Amino acid sequence: MSGGLSRRRVAAASSDEERPEMRSVSHSKSHLEGYDDDHKIAFDPKDLEQGAEREKQPRLTLMEEVLLLGLKDKQGYLSFWNDSISYSLRGCILMELAFRGKLRMQKDVNRKRFPLADRVVELVDEKLTGEVLLDEAIKMIHTSELMSVTSWIDLMSGETWNVMKIGYQLRQVRERLAKGLVDKGILRNEKKNFLLFDMPTHPIADTSIKDSIKKRVVSVLTSRVIEIDNSPSFPEYLSFRCLRTVALACSSYAANVLENALDNLNYEDREKAFSRVDELLCDFSQWPFDLHASSSVGANLPELISEELSSVKEEQLLFIEVVAAVLQVFTHLDSLL
């Protein structure tokens, strides 16, 4: 009798122990059934800010466009003899920050006493862009003393005797730009054997992007009337479309990769294009820009640039002054002298 009672008690206890589990399971089921109605997903607000920022900007940065022009399409690497592109890419970083409204000349009436490239620049928007190199430059400039355009390009290139400022050098710029282009689906990763070593290469996967870049450059340097086509990578709603293209042509010239954009032209037209980019670099490396109509090439360029500049407030011209300062630095490169 007592054994039976004992067994019944055990069974009852077992039943009681199972009930909370059943209630827990049923509660979980009911919770899951209502999950679709009012669920919440955690997110980082910075991701939304960077997404909104990217929608307003071109698909490729100025640095990426210059690198693309320098890359051999099938081999996927830059010329081993090109020692100009590294310095030019650092200048492109400053210009890209200026085009995005983040870096401008310090608002000081006395700045005009100094050469354009020696004027001090300041960071006015420290929000990150989602572009690795731009974000690294933003953090560096934000936490540093105020310096000139020339100083920043020199420091980011590692061209300084000051051991205290060696840390300002941006390292592996070309490789990181190539990785970004791989992520964007424009390049692909490969490895090729050079003598005894395997070297990463990045052949072009989407040639249409590079073709559109070359077309813009050729139009600015050879066309009687400049027309910049609308494309997914360079949409019509972008600000400073024409000025960006001029900066691209001049930067490519300074980086010694412009010839790759002109490979479909005959010898005479190539020589004219190089003469034209020399003129553009001279005209746009001063502030205000020297806008005058050419009799043979780009007759409407002054009008296009004037329209772009007239659409911004006077204070915003301080950003464009940075672009002119970088181009002035380029005029002093050994490769162009």
Swiss-Prot record:
GO biological process assignments: endoplasmic reticulum unfolded protein response; Golgi organization; Golgi to plasma membrane protein transport; Golgi vesicle budding; protein localization to Golgi apparatus; retrograde vesicle-mediated transport, Golgi to endoplasmic reticulum
Residue list for modification Phosphoserine: S15
The keyword Phosphoprotein is assigned to this record: yes
Mode of membrane association: Peripheral membrane protein
Subcellular location: Golgi apparatus, Golgi stack membrane
GO CC field: cytosol; Golgi apparatus; Golgi cisterna; Golgi cisterna membrane; Golgi membrane; nucleus; trans-Golgi network
Assembly description: Homotetramer.
Biological role stated in the UniProt entry: Phosphatidylinositol-4-phosphate-binding protein that links Golgi membranes to the cytoskeleton and may participate in the tensile force required for vesicle budding from the Golgi. Thereby, may play a role in Golgi membrane trafficking and could indirectly give its flattened shape to the Golgi apparatus. May also bind to the coatomer to regulate Golgi membrane trafficking. May play a role in anterograde transport from the Golgi to the plasma membrane and regulate secretion.
PANTHER family in alphabetical order: GOLGI PHOSPHOPROTEIN 3 HOMOLOG SAURON, TRANS-GOLGI PROTEIN GMX33
Name of this protein: Vacuolar protein sorting-associated protein 74
Classification of source organism: Eukaryota, Fungi, Dikarya, Ascomycota, Taphrinomycotina
Gene label: vps74
